Regions:
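Glycine-rich, flexible N-terminal cofactor/catalytic loop recognition
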Residues: 1-46
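General beta-strand structural signal in soluble alpha/beta enzymes
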Residues: 22, 97-100, 147, 173
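Conserved helicase motor
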Residues: 44-50, 124-127
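Short glycine-cluster motifs
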Residues: 61-121
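A short, charged helix-loop
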Residues: 118-140, 215
Length: 247
């Protein structure tokens, strides 16, 4: 993220807690060096969280305080901090959240899409069945949807979204939010696919998908028809055979 986004309250916490649990100690050291202070750091990430959580809980029970820091964004959103917080709550330990940057909310506000009702999906599952179920829900949902994705998998996801939601579905893709090379891309899925064609994608990606806008019509419900077509093709029918079946 951007070092200037950290609050005075967050800096005060980092200075005065017993120790700091951070996703990458090297990144947290940069923050401390920038503001001329230090503290005891331990690594806490997806690779060591199962072993670290019991030790951190024991430290908290003994009266120590700990600050949880992620590499970017809000700790506990799409990272192992969620498991630590849940375990601390189950042990009736005090949790205080210090407000800070969150890519999903930053992108949502910047998108211009309706923000009073939205769905946060984070990173989609890798298993095809679970993934398709969520994409089908996004396809028919009137609410704005928020996704995170790796730059290496973005093109695959965009093609999946086009297949299920259609190329004209409203979308905004945000790259490197709050950083020097921040980008806001697109208006439709087709536009975003064209933009990234033949490009090497780098950086952190946040995707905002506009809700489905149902047209007033007496014809067959297009969403249900498209869903049925998708399921028939998935079941093994060719696209032409499935189309004839539904005709």
């Amino acid at each position: 993220g951007n070092l200037n986004d950290i609050s005075a309250r967050a800096l005060n916490i980092l200075k005065n807690v017993s120790f700091v649990a951070c996703e990458d100690t090297r990144q947290t050291i940069k923050i401390m060096e920038s503001y001329n202070f230090s503290n005891h750091l331990i690594s806490f990430n997806k690779h060591n969280s199962k072993n670290r959580i019991p030790k951190i809980i024991q430290s908290l029970k003994s009266g120590q305080s700990v600050a949880l820091v992620s590499d970017a964004g809000m700790p506990g959103i799409c990272d192992p901090g969620e498991d630590l917080i849940r375990t601390a709550r189950s042990n009736e330990l005090s949790i205080i959240c210090i407000p800070g940057p969150c890519a999903g909310i930053t992108a949502l506000v910047s998108s211009g899409f309706p923000s009073s009702k939205f769905i946060f999906e984070g990173f989609l599952p890798k298993k095809n069945i679970e993934r398709e179920e969520i994409l089908l829900e996004i396809m028919k949902s009137p609410k704005t949807s928020i996704l995170y994705e790796s730059p290496y998998r973005l093109k695959k996801l965009l093609n999946e979204l086009k297949s299920i939601c259609g190329g004209e579905r409203k979308i905004k893709v945000f790259r490197e939010l709050t950083k020097r090379y921040e980008e806001h891309i697109g208006d439709t899925i087709d536009e975003v696919i064209t933009f990234f064609e033949n490009k090497e994608i780098k950086g952190e990606i946040t995707i905002i998908i506009g809700g489905f806008e149902k047209e007033e019509t007496n014809d067959i419900d297009e969403i249900n028809l498209k869903k049925e077509l998708h399921l028939l093709v998935k079941a093994g029918l060719s696209l032409s055979s499935a189309s004839k079946y539904l005709a």
